[in-house]
């Protein structure tokens, strides 16, 4: 769908809510808008692709720490871990989105 059709959907939703009352619930309009259009398939964002890329550089796909963890680190269990305050952005981008320009070497630029 092009941008004009998406804009028409938003305007029609807002006008429908405005005709039924004084307020327009923006979160509900946004939720309907996000569910109205199909998600783009592919682009390497699947969970399987994230796990495969994380395993290729020996990192956890959730918190981007070294996995399997070192003997003295206890923060990553690969089940309930979350990223820390300052994690490596290059590693996170590679795990989330993959590589488009260069092929990284494990342990070289990470």
UniProtKB/Swiss-Prot annotation:
A GO molecular function held by the record: DNA binding
What keywords sit in the KW lines? DNA-binding, Host-virus interaction, Inhibition of host innate immune response by virus, Metal-binding, Suppressor of RNA silencing, Viral immunoevasion, Zinc, Zinc-finger
InterPro entries assigned to the protein according to its UniProt record, in alphabetical order: Carla-bd (IPR002568)
Which parts of the sequence are annotated with region: Basic? 50-53
Q: Is this entry keyworded NAD?
A: no
Per the record, the domain of life is Viruses
Keyword Zinc-finger listed? The answer is: yes
Q: Where are the zinc fingers (C4-type)?
A: 60-81
| GO terms under biological process | regulation of DNA-templated transcription; symbiont-mediated suppression of host innate immune response
Function recorded in the entry: Suppressor of viral-induced RNA silencing. The potential mechanism of action is based on sequestering siRNAs.
UniProt family annotation: Belongs to the carlaviruses nucleic acid-binding protein family.
Name-wise, this protein is RNA silencing suppressor
| Organism listed in the record | Helenium virus S (HelVS)
């Amino acid at each position: 769908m092009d941008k004009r059709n998406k804009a028409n959907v938003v305007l029609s939703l807002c006008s429908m809510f405005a005709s039924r009352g004084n307020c327009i619930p923006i979160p509900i309009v946004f939720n309907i808008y996000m569910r109205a259009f199909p998600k783009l398939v592919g682009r390497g964002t699947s969970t399987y692709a994230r796990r495969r890329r994380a395993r290729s550089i020996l990192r956890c796909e959730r918190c981007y720490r070294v996995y399997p963890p070192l003997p003295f680190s206890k923060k990553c269990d690969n089940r309930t871990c979350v990223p820390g305050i300052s994690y490596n952005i290059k590693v996170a981008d590679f795990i989330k989105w993959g590589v488009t320009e260069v092929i990284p070497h494990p342990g070289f630029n990470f």
